[in-house]
Amino acid sequence: MRNEKVYEWLKNRGFEGRLTEHSETIDTVEHAAQQIGCSEAEIAKTLSFIVDDKPVVVVMAGDGRVNSSKFKALFHTKPSMIPRDMVVEMTGFAPGGVCPFGVPADIPIWLDISMKRFEYVHPAGGNEFTSVRLTPEELEKASDAVGWCDVCKGWEETV
């Protein structure tokens, strides 16, 4: 059930063996934490937004929520999620499996600092039945991220 595109993407960057297949869905932060056996905060949720009519991906800790003011300061627009029925077309992945690995090259990937407090984080692996275990630094390398950002709120209370 693994996503071959994601498997090859990770393998080509030296992260072979990090993709884990699950018997139950990990389509939400809650489901992912239950299947992986970690806190919900350690789930690296991948959100896809429209900025200037183009997709942008932001990966953040599972307990983080988008802070509109911080988002606008970075992207110069209010946060607007990609409509659910357009997620596959724009990112290459279905909702519940969107990940920062193997998205089209013209989509910038940002990592929120909310994940830096953890030894490991767990983003989806391209579908709702796979995840990847990486340190935040490894996630930065594996995702070809633009860099780190600060667009979340809510997670500071749980540090």
Give the location of each predicted region.
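Extended, low-hydrophobicity, polar/charged segments
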Residues: 1-159
